[in-house]
Swiss-Prot record:
It is found in: Cytoplasm. The N-terminal region contains the highly conserved SGGXDS motif, predicted to be a P-loop motif involved in ATP binding. It is an enzyme of class 6 (ligase). SUPFAM superfamilies: Adenine nucleotide alpha hydrolases-like. Signal peptide: none annotated. Gene3D superfamilies: HUPs. One of its GO terms (cellular component) is cytoplasm. One of its GO terms (molecular function) is tRNA(Ile)-lysidine synthase activity. Its EC number is 6.3.4.19. Ligates lysine onto the cytidine present at position 34 of the AUA codon-specific tRNA(Ile) that contains the anticodon CAU, in an ATP-dependent manner. Cytidine is converted to lysidine, thus changing the amino acid specificity of the tRNA from methionine to isoleucine. It catalyses: cytidine(34) in tRNA(Ile2) + L-lysine + ATP = lysidine(34) in tRNA(Ile2) + AMP + diphosphate + H(+). InterPro entries: Rossmann-like_a/b/a_fold, TilS/TtcA_N, tRNA_Ile_lys_synt, tRNA_Ile_lys_synt_N. This is tRNA(Ile)-lysidine synthase.
Length: 448
């Protein structure tokens, strides 16, 4: 008996979408996904449009022909297909990670262009096991949050859901399904290239591992991650736990923090460091432990700089403080009609007709600006403005948005951005992200 498309796909609610993107490389996993998905959508009364998208990473001479062959197969079976190419210069290091980032960027753009609510990928149970083993080797200990491996659901760029419905299906089961249907697949030779981490794990430790035992460890890691997340969600429900000012400085109640378990404390302070620093990832396990020890008073320093964030321990009941350090702050152009993220912390949209540069003000420049506008603010607020975005026009400081009573250029909009959640949000962390956003908010106000 073959695999059941209804059992595989129904839990994901694909039927509510206008269109669904299937990421198809031509390998057995993605082709198995495509044809099972096609069968499932045919059972729906008003099915979404199925669009197969092949990303040609331009890493091998054969890739263009392979993408073309996927298109011919789709044409034969009445499936829409398009090819997207990664034409950017390829990095000398971190090629696999860069290719993955480019692939998802292209897939998200394809989904937005098609009005698709879902991108569906063919990650299998084998991939899940490999991911666990890769992350375990990197982390060096079993408490790492990443050992929960891949989530069946993720949210990409805040708008497109990534579904991985085959995480409980083996690669061999998909190949048996394709063989039964008489459909051939292509084996990418890079999958056997041990210069890359995943093939090295696949052909080494994963081949010798007890798959069922690994899956049990994944479940245990997932449960631990859920416990820590739930503790933070509960803590964040209390408004006294966490506060924020306009520039993004966060104030963590020391007593609320101390009441959490060590694992939850490490997660909480690591998360706030990532938000303050505008980073897409948590600090590593060792860094999170270091932050927790400092805030808990186990280590002598009262200040740490981690991940672009300056973290200060509160004393005598004062809150712990998290803010951006004043280094490596970017300068970006903001032209009419443009939507950009500045420093991973603020999102700007220019619906007006003027162009600006966004950058932090210099200290003397800010002092002169305040003097010329007849303003006088205390030192703490001035320091906050120095790590906040300002608007320049024609090389001249035109506006300091977070200054009390500041005049904003017409058509310029700003809101808070959470880089750790707004680009790739694993389903494991949906509730945590909602709790953080509810407490910190998106709207930005003046520094008062």
């Amino acid at each position: 008996m073959g695999l059941s498309p209804v059992n595989i796909f129904k839990p994901f609610g694909l039927g509510r979408a206008k269109a669904v993107i299937a990421a198809v490389s031509g390998g057995s996993d993605s082709l198995g996904l495509l044809f099972l998905l096609k069968d499932y959508l045919s059972t729906l009364e008003s099915p979404p449009v199925l669009i197969a998208v092949t990303v040609d990473h331009k890493l091998r001479a054969e890739s263009a022909l392979e993408a073309e062959n996927v298109g011919l197969l789709c044409q034969k079976h009445g499936i829409m297909h398009c090819v997207l190419s990664w034409d950017d210069p390829k990095p000398a290091h971190g090629l696999a990670a860069a290719a993955r980032t480019a692939r998802y960027r292209l897939l998200v753009q394809a989904a937005r262009d098609a009005g698709a609510g879902f991108i569906v990928t063919g990650h299998t149970e084998n991939d899940q096991i490999e991911t666990f083993l890769m992350r375990k080797a990197r982390s060096g200990h079993c408490e790492a949050r990443g050992l929960a491996a891949m989530s069946p659901r993720s949210l990409l760029e805040g708008s497109v859901e990534l579904a991985r419905p085959l995480l409980t299906v083996s690669r061999q089961a998909l190949r048996d399904e394709l063989t039964r249907r008489g459909i051939a697949w292509v084996d990418d030779p890079s999958n056997a290239n041990i210069d890359y981490e995943r093939p090295r794990v696949r052909l080494g430790v994963a081949a010798e591992a007890d798959g069922q035992e690994v899956l049990e460890q994944i479940a245990q890691a997932g449960a631990a991650r859920e416990r820590d997340n739930a503790a933070l969600v509960e803590a964040l429900a209390d408004p006294a736990t966490l506060g924020v000012d306009a520039a993004g400085m966060m104030f963590l109640n020391a007593d609320c923090y101390a009441a959490l378990s060590p694992g939850a404390r490490q997660l909480f302070s690591g998360l706030l460091a990532s938000i303050a620093g505008g980073r897409r990832f948590l600090p590593g396990d060792g860094e999170r432990r270091r932050i927790e020890r400092m805030l808990s008073g186990q280590d002598a320093p009262r200040r740490l700089t981690v991940f672009g964030a300056l973290i200060e321990r509160g004393e005598k009941g004062a809150p712990h403080r998290f803010r951006r350090e004043r280094r490596n702050l970017p300068k970006l152009d903001l032209v009419p009609g443009q939507h950009i993220v500045w420093d991973g912390r603020f999102c700007f949209f220019n619906s007006g007709g003027r162009s600006f540069e966004i950058a932090p003000p210099g200290r003397q420049e800010l002092i002169d600006f305040l003097k010329n506008s007849g303003r006088d603010i205390e030192s703490r607020r001035c320091e906050a403005l120095l790590i906040s975005p300002a608007l320049y026009e024609g090389g001249k400081l035109a506006s300091v948005p977070f200054l009390p009573g500041a005049e904003w250029p017409q058509g310029v909009h700003i809101e808070r951005h959470f880089a750790i959640f707004d680009h790739v949000l694993p389903g494991h962390d949906f509730a945590l992200a909602q709790a953080v956003e509810a407490r910190l908010g998106r709207a930005c106000a003046e520094i008062s």
